[in-house]
A protein has these predicted regions:
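FAD/FMN-dependent oxidoreductases across multiple families
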Residues: 49-138
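Conserved FAD-binding catalytic core of PHBH/FMO-like flavoproteins
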Residues: 1-76
Length: 170
């Protein structure tokens, strides 16, 4: 139901050390600092908003931007947002990871946080297997799936529910 419009802005130097997310009637607008001079913008716009052109996205950004001055915009990239959680985390000895494992709305970067948590669990499982002198095989993948699947399902559905609350028109 949403499209993420992403672009980079170059701007006058600012103390750019905090991410910011604004919830607009069109969808969440995230400011993700890259340096004192650059910021990544992710604007997840509801399809009901009928915002389609790059110029409309730039105009909306300008409306909500209160921080950055003398802006130069990069080209906008568009990504259709979808919600998917894999039923099976591995096949043979191939493990799905990151967005191939769980695609959720980029609300406050929670998909990335889920991937970092998954990575920590995988690393801990690898260390445990190596400490026992065992070889890494399909059992590792099965254990990883067992430890992460229910949490990922619950967490991703919670993010999906929270995101849907922001779409409610009052």
């Amino acid at each position: 139901n949403s499209t993420a419009f992403t672009f980079i802005i170059n701007h006058e130097p600012v103390n750019n050390n905090k991410s910011l997310q604004i919830f607009t009637k069109h969808g969440p607008l995230a400011f993700l600092p890259l340096s004192k001079f650059q910021t990544s913008i992710v604007f997840s716009i509801n399809k009901k908003s009928f915002i389609r052109s790059d110029s409309e996205v730039y105009d909306l950004f300008k409306k909500y931007n209160k921080i950055y001055k003398k802006i130069k915009f990069s080209k906008i990239e568009k990504v259709e947002l979808k919600f998917e959680v894999a039923r099976h985390y591995y096949h043979d000895e191939i493990l799905l990871f990151g967005d191939s494992l769980h695609q959720i709305h980029p609300l406050a970067g929670q998909g990335f946080n889920m991937t970092i948590r998954d990575l920590q669990i995988l690393i801990n499982e690898i260390i445990k297997i190596k400490d026992l002198g065992l070889t890494i095989n399909k059992n590792l993948l099965k254990e990883f799936q067992t430890k992460t699947k229910s949490y990922n399902f619950l967490y991703s559905n919670s993010i999906n529910l929270i995101e849907s609350f922001f779409k409610i028109d009052n």
